[in-house]
Amino acid sequence: MNSFLEYPILGSGDSGTCSARAYPSDHGITTFQSCAVSANSCGGDDRFLVGRGVQISSPHHHHHHHHHHHPQTATYQTSGNLGISYSHSSCGPSYGAQNFSAPYGPYGLNQEADVSGGYPPCAPAVYSGNLSTPMVQHHHHHQGYAGGTVGSPQYIHHSYGQEQQTLALATYNNSLSPLHASHQEACRSPASETSSPAQTFDWMKVKRNPPKTGKVGEYGYVGQPNAVRTNFTTKQLTELEKEFHFNKYLTRARRVEIAASLQLNETQVKIWFQNRRMKQKKREKEGLLPISPATPPGSDEKTEESSEKSSPSPSAPSPASSTSDTLTTSH
């Protein structure tokens, strides 16, 4: 990050000229070079002050009428009120310290700044620019002295790093301003919707009787715990009651046969017989019906199965004949 400080002084006539000089700045502490400002020549103990008693001196001076580059080192610090004084033994008119207050704003380290300006010889300098309050480090300065008539020149120092940063932030904010506006509108819209009474949709309502999802079989809904209740017709109920009167328990073959004859499925017939048996027991407990002889469950089924599988058995003696036989033997 080597930078050079250029001080070209262009003079005319009898007035001495100072060759254009470029000095590299020290990277540890930013350097500021000085050039003898006089009406006749550049030489001797040349110095000028920047800030509160901070002296910037140039120990070596070289008089050349051609452009040369000589490295020199000088340090400077800045303060709120910048005072600049020029002193030279051979300077014709006596120039006192030009004290003034220049507003400046600090900018961060490692920022580059371009410096350009014009200085005629032995003239009061006007300083305006931005310098950091502590020591400014690692800056590229390109400074020049341009000769002309003795007047009020200006030494301009611009902090391009800070300006670019502020410009970038400004453009960034400007570019994002419509986005922020749209985002704020989007944020406000849900609030306005929530403030209004909420709309109730059909899917939000609680269904007390949800629709049946069971597959419709040949005889209605099958295989679901919440199956639709079967509405039996009068003919179906009559046939089921007749069968229940003779057989409280059905075999699977008989159940299939009844289901086919009544256009019902096997499950419906089975459930109807289960419910009918529970109803029968309930009535017997209440005393509405006489208690039927207790038959173990499945006895009728076993008898039916045995009757279906076995061949017809020989006729058994009737109870009347058996009693008559016993009476005759007793006599």
Curated annotation (Swiss-Prot):
Residue segments, region Disordered: 57-79, 279-331
CDD domains associated with the record: homeodomain
UniProt induction comment: By retinoic acid.
Entry GO CC: nucleoplasm
PTM annotation: Glycosylated by OGT.
Main subcellular location of this protein, as a coarse class: nucleus
Basic and acidic residues bias: start-end ranges: 299-308
SUPFAM superfamilies linked: Homeodomain-like
Family matches, as PROSITE patterns: HOMEOBOX_1, HOMEOBOX_2
GO biological process: anatomical structure formation involved in morphogenesis; anatomical structure morphogenesis; anterior/posterior pattern specification; cellular response to ethanol; cellular response to retinoic acid; central nervous system neuron differentiation; facial nerve structural organization; facial nucleus development
Motif, Antp-type hexapeptide: chain positions: 200-205
Compartments in which it is found: Nucleus
GO molecular function: DNA-binding transcription factor activity, RNA polymerase II-specific; sequence-specific DNA binding
Homology family: Belongs to the Antp homeobox family. Labial subfamily.
Function: Sequence-specific transcription factor. Regulates multiple developmental processes including brainstem, inner and outer ear, abducens nerve and cardiovascular development and morphogenesis as well as cognition and behavior. Also part of a developmental regulatory system that provides cells with specific positional identities on the anterior-posterior axis. Acts on the anterior body structures. Seems to act in the maintenance and/or generation of hindbrain segments. Activates transcription in the presence of PBX1A and PKNOX1.
Subunit relationships: Interacts with OGT (via TPR repeats domain); the interaction takes place mainly in the nucleus. Forms a DNA-binding heterodimer with transcription factor PBX1.
Protein name as it appears in the record: Homeobox protein Hox-A1
Organism from which the protein derives: Mus musculus
Gene: Hoxa1
